[in-house]
Amino acid sequence: MQCVLLAAGYATRLYPLTENMPKALLKLGDKTILEMVTDKIDEVSDVENIYIVTNEKFYKQFEKWCESYKGPKKVKVINDHTTSNDNRLGAIGDLKYVIDTENINDEILVMASDNIFDFSLCDFVDMYRSKNADMICAHTIENKEDFMTLLHGMLINESVYMPVLHVTLPFI
């Protein structure tokens, strides 16, 4: 099994914070979001390699991060050569790009590089193995109050981000 981490977005909604830093490399406490994700992937013995697909703008930053990775997996950063939102490939395009350039002919665990989660991927992969079927991992938000937005001292009762889609990757 191979793992593809999607990291080719430009995170424009978080500007200026992410204007010169990819979202996955932002630190939460003493770890980057990407470290939190790779820690979870490292627990999955089935995963042999991690491919991080990114863009031209952030490629060198991911390469630098990769040099400091101390986990058990082989990690490779792949540049999709896009330079802006206007010419980006999108998630499916980037996945195809990695499959084609790396000649992957194996099961693939596809994940966003910037989603934080606290569950083990091992049970998810075990379920995939037992069902022998493609799987998508989703998470129900029980307490939507945790996702309210505070704006200028006023509480906004509902903040909807990507309204219809309440899915947390990874998926196989």
Residue ranges and their predicted role:
Residues 2-5, 13, 31-110, 116, ...:
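Conserved N-terminal catalytic core of the sugar/cofactor nucleotidyltransferase
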Residues 23-27, 82-86, 171:
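A short acidic, glycine-rich active-site loop
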Residues 29, 79-81, 139, 165:
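Residues at the C-termini of beta-strands that transition into short coil/loop
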Residues 118-172:
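Conserved core of the sugar-phosphate nucleotidyltransferase
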Residues 20-24, 68-70, 125-129:
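Glycine-rich, phosphate-binding/catalytic loops in enzymes
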Residues 20-36:
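Short catalytic helix/loop segments, enriched in acidic residues and glycine
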Residues 1-18, 25:
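N-proximal low-complexity "stem/linker" segments adjacent to membrane-targeting elements
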